[in-house]
Amino acid sequence: MEGPAFSKSPKDKTIERAFLGVLGILFVTGGLASRDNPHQVYNITWEVTNGEQDTVWAVTGNHPLWTWWPDLTPDLCMLALHGPTHWGLDNHPPYSSPPGPPCCSGDAGAVSGCARDCDEPLTSYSPRCNTAWNRLKLARVTHAPKEGFYICPGSHRPRWARSCGGLDAYYCASWGCETTGRAAWNPTSSWDYITVSNNLTSSQATKACKNNGWCNPLVIRFTGPGKRATSWTTGHFWGLRLYISGHDPGLTFGIRLKVTDLGPRVPIGPNPVLSDQRPPSRPVPARPPPPSASPSTPTIPPQQGTGDRLLNLVQGAYLTLNMTDPTRTQECWLCLVSEPPYYEGVAVLREYTSHETAPANCSSGSQHKLTLSEVTGQGRCLGTVPKTHQALCNRTEPTVSGSNYLVAPEGTLWACSTGLTPCLSTTVLNLTTDYCVLVELWPKVTYHSPDYVYTQFEPGARFRREPVSLTLALLPEGLTMGGIAAGVGTGTTALVATQQFQQLQAAMHNDLKEVEKSITNLEKSLTSLSEVVLQNRRGLDLLFLKEGGLCAALKEECCFYADHTGLVRDSMAKLRERLNQRQKLFESGQGWFEGLFNRSPWFTTLISTIMGPLIVLLLILLFGPCILNRLVQFVKDRISVVQALVLTQQYHQLKPIEYEP
């Protein structure tokens, strides 16, 4: 067999490839920016392109980012569409049937319009794709033990691979550039992103070619480095060459990733946050329908404002509390907390559902990371939970097998280290250090007894204790969905209470939506402000004065910047002036002794140091003489007593003598 134009023995190629493979592994970062919610599902499309970067094969699925790595199975001839002329498909349109006449049968062409007999011996002409007979010869080459094909990377190769050439050599200008393929020396690599091989056996390919179909399908699999790369949205390219006698024909192909959101998020109109700040709408009195046989036109309910949403939160909390414990609502006050955190979570132990395909709510993830700053209780945890949060776990599942989607029960959410989400991807959970806790959301509504409210209106002379307030999530009985559902066994109002709880959950869900819209509008406002500030209007207007100014030269709408920093400086100056006045007023009310401490810092230190000894000395001078006199008098009295005892010991008492008359 005649060697190729840059022929080397397979043994030499194996040694050189092994030497080059030790030089390192290429890690590619960048590309698609990481999204906020790693469990959110997107519409992902893997596209295989030809040398003109036209899509010739694609596969689509709904999965989280960087979790779906399917096998790509394009046909080798599809990669040659609009490619080099020697492949015979330079004018063949993509996504169409194979070109050319079919093969003839074994008996001298019984099929009308056939080209030649596929059972006859194949000549040494180069394999092509324009007829069934040529595609059959291509299949024989790609499956032959001493022939085949090899792949060379182009866009992501390391620096030492500069000798591999460019598009003219299909990135395979020298031996050692090949990283995968199906050839006699079995080319491999430890850093390339893909492996390529045949997807059919020789007999299966022969049968498909004789039926005038695409009969040279490849199977492209992603390697470990390829799954770690995040630059697939820009695309990567490779070269493919056949290993045959003479010059090795080749082509180039690419692989790229296309990501789109499942649901559109299109803002309409000006900033909706400012126009949405409306008070609670008044209820419209019900009117009887007019007597008419014509059907009434359904009316669209007005959009709720901020006041309506806040009132719905308090009303939903009251209805839930009233149906579960009516004694607490006979006389009470429910207050919606007006400062963060606005919500608190209660960990619950409930059963989730597992799905093989992504449900609809998995694509409705938030655009921003919402964090719960207060979570109580014990519930179900997934992933590797740190020690600081293990107190929230009643049951922990470190890993979840398979590649499924875990949907939280109705009325609950997964509180993860990456934010709140209604759906989890086990693939993301097992590949990352993320952990999640199943929680129920409760608005920060404070429960007050009537005594607390009454004391607020009593005279100020009465001493008021610090109020003991409880939020709904911290009430002794607990108002979680699990606790409400437990009342079904005892009858009573469990079903109605569950409906009230769901109404409260719906109110919280609407409020969270508005919070997300507010964050989005704030982001857009900051972006718009930064664009305005970056325009150096004054200087550029002078440069483009002949064209009518900067806006006329750029053909853009003029932007104007309202600078309020001067007002801020004036306010700060007035604040400093008031502080100085208060300081002078405070100093004028001090006595001369207090003023000494404010004049010099060393004087304060000196006084505090010698004050103790001076006080002790003063006390000694005042009370020392009196104490000394009393002590001397006491000693004299004791000495007099001792002297009297000594004198009495020298004399004896005489007994009286009685004389008889």
Curated annotation (Swiss-Prot):
Keywords noted in UniProt: Cleavage on pair of basic residues, Coiled coil, Disulfide bond, Fusion of virus membrane with host cell membrane, Fusion of virus membrane with host membrane, Glycoprotein, Host cell membrane, Host membrane, Host-virus interaction, Lipoprotein, Membrane, Metal-binding, Palmitate, Signal, Transmembrane, Transmembrane helix, Viral attachment to host cell, Viral envelope protein, Viral penetration into host cytoplasm, Virion, Virus entry into host cell, Zinc
Residues the UniProt record annotates as site (Cleavage): R465, E466, L645, V646
Motif CXXC, residue range(s) on this chain: 332-335
Residue span of motif YXXL motif: 651-654
Keyword Membrane: yes
GO molecular function: metal ion binding
Annotated spans, Disordered: 268-308
Residue ranges crossing the lipid bilayer per the database entry: 607-627
Role summary: The surface protein (SU) attaches the virus to the host cell by binding to its receptor. This interaction triggers the refolding of the transmembrane protein (TM) and is thought to activate its fusogenic potential by unmasking its fusion peptide. Fusion occurs at the host cell plasma membrane. The transmembrane protein (TM) acts as a class I viral fusion protein. Under the current model, the protein has at least 3 conformational states: pre-fusion native state, pre-hairpin intermediate state, and post-fusion hairpin state. During viral and target cell membrane fusion, the coiled coil regions (heptad repeats) assume a trimer-of-hairpins structure, positioning the fusion peptide in close proximity to the C-terminal region of the ectodomain. The formation of this structure appears to drive apposition and subsequent fusion of viral and target cell membranes.
Receptor-binding domain (RBD), as annotated region: 32-267
Post-translational modification: Specific enzymatic cleavages in vivo yield mature proteins. Envelope glycoproteins are synthesized as an inactive precursor that is N-glycosylated and processed likely by host cell furin or by a furin-like protease in the Golgi to yield the mature SU and TM proteins. The cleavage site between SU and TM requires the minimal sequence [KR]-X-[KR]-R. The R-peptide is released from the C-terminus of the cytoplasmic tail of the TM protein upon particle formation as a result of proteolytic cleavage by the viral protease. Cleavage of this peptide is required for TM to become fusogenic. The CXXC motif is highly conserved across a broad range of retroviral envelope proteins. It is thought to participate in the formation of a labile disulfide bond possibly with the CX6CC motif present in the transmembrane protein. Isomerization of the intersubunit disulfide bond to an SU intrachain disulfide bond is thought to occur upon receptor recognition in order to allow membrane fusion.
Residues annotated to bind Zn(2+): H86, D117
Coiled-coil portions: 497-533
Renumbered residue ranges of the record's region Immunosuppression: 534-550
Signal peptide range in chain numbering: 1-33
Glycosylation sites: N43, N199, N322, N361, N394, N430
Classification via CDD domains: HTLV-1-like_HR1-HR2 (cd09851)
Protein's UniProt name: Envelope glycoprotein
A GO CC term attached to the entry: membrane
Gene3D superfamilies named among the record's database cross-references: 1.10.287.210, ENV polyprotein, receptor-binding domain
Annotated source species: Cas-Br-E murine leukemia virus
